[in-house]
A protein has these predicted regions:
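Bacterial N-terminal signal peptides that target proteins for export
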Residues: 1-17
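Active-site-proximal beta-strand elements of phosphoester/diester hydrolases
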Residues: 51, 231-233, 272-276
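A glycine-rich, often tryptophan-bearing local segment used as a flexible ligand/cofactor-contacting loop or short
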Residues: 101, 110, 114-208
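Helical hinge/lid and interdomain linker segments adjacent to catalytic or ligand-binding clefts
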Residues: 32-39, 46-145
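Catalytic beta-strand/loop cores that center a nucleophilic Ser/Cys/Thr
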Residues: 33-35, 70, 75-76, 90-93, ...
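A short acidic/glycine-rich loop-to-helix N-cap element
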Residues: 278-288
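Bacterial N-terminal signal peptides
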Residues: 14-27
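Proline-centered loop/turn at the N-terminus of a beta-strand
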Residues: 134-136, 229, 270
């Protein structure tokens, strides 16, 4: 069996990405922050990555993306993880030291789920959103925060995905990303997803060079809103393979979009939301390019 030059290049890139994920798995990383300094030329911009979910391995996805953006695109990247009491990474932990890094950040990439951060930590996210900083939200960040009734008097209770107050209905997910938790679309961990570019959006800057997007994560329901600029549609497949047949019972559903949210005093912040982003998803070159 012969392997083409293009095939070797693709294999090499895949091995490098797998290595990056392994190096920064929860067993090895033990303290916040992990910092990747910008390669040359530097853009002079800083991105903060906030990782803490307990199912899709945000603690693997975000360091890999941060390193790519630093080495190949010239961004200074700071990755913050949920930590346990010993200072070691704990998937889904509601303890993320170092969030003060958001004070001078030019962008925030968030991948969290059901967090109830201490007031002194959540304040930094609140401050960032008040100044309408750009946000990229992945997968479970639509339900990234969850506060129980014991914390109803917490100043940041409104960020909970179940918040029903008229001042911030739907919490962080709805108010910032445009979508709160709705539910799975198909059988998660049994059906993978093909992501197709909407033809009319093929020239959008975010979609430059994006093709053949397949992700392992199962579909999420999306209730499209008028203020979404929808870029892609997700088609659930019958198998976990890229060539799996379409699930004919599941029409395509919006999967990536842009929008604006309102910070303090009505200032608008830019948002990109993806309903995917599991660590297996970024093994696909098309999805990595999309993010």
């Amino acid at each position: 069996m012969s392997i083409t030059k293009a095939g070797l290049s693709s294999l090499y890139s895949r091995l490098l990405l797998v290595l990056a994920i392994l190096l920064f798995s929860g067993a090895l990383a033990s303290a916040n922050p992990v910092i990747y300094k910008a390669g040359n030329p530097s853009k002079g911009k800083k991105i903060v990555f906030v990782a803490s979910d307990h199912e899709y391995r945000a603690e693997e996805t975000l360091p890999a993306l941060a390193r790519i953006l630093a080495v190949h695109h010239g961004f200074d990247c700071t990755v913050l993880f949920g930590l346990d009491g010993n200072g070691e990474i704990e998937a889904g932990a509601s303890n993320i030291p170092g969030l003060e890094a958001l004070k001078d950040a030019d962008g925030m990439v968030i991948f969290t789920r059901f967090l109830a951060l201490p007031v002194e930590q959540m304040k930094h996210i609140d401050d960032y959103l008040n100044r309408a900083g750009p946000v990229v939200g992945l997968r479970t960040s639509t339900h990234g925060f969850k506060y129980d009734d014991k914390r109803k008097n917490d100043p940041y209770y409104k960020y909970s995905f179940r918040y029903t107050g008229e001042d911030y209905s739907g919490g962080f997910g709805h108010q910032v990303l445009g979508q709160s938790w709705v539910g799975h679309y198909g059988r998660n961990h049994q059906q993978s997803t093909r992501i197709d570019i909407i033809p009319e959006k093929k020239n959008h800057p975010i979609l430059k060079g994006v093709s053949k997007v397949h992700v392992h994560a199962g579909g999420y329901n999306a209730e499209a809103q008028k203020d979404w600029d929808i870029l892609t549609m997700a088609q659930p497949l019958m198998t976990m393979k890229p060539d799996g047949a379409d699930d004919k019972t599941k029409p395509p559903m919006a999967s990536e979009w842009t929008r604006h949210y309102k910070g303090k005093n009505g200032k608008k912040g830019r948002v990109f939301t993806s309903l995917y982003g599991a660590s297996e998803d970024i093994l696909n070159a098309g999805y990595r390019r999309l993010i």
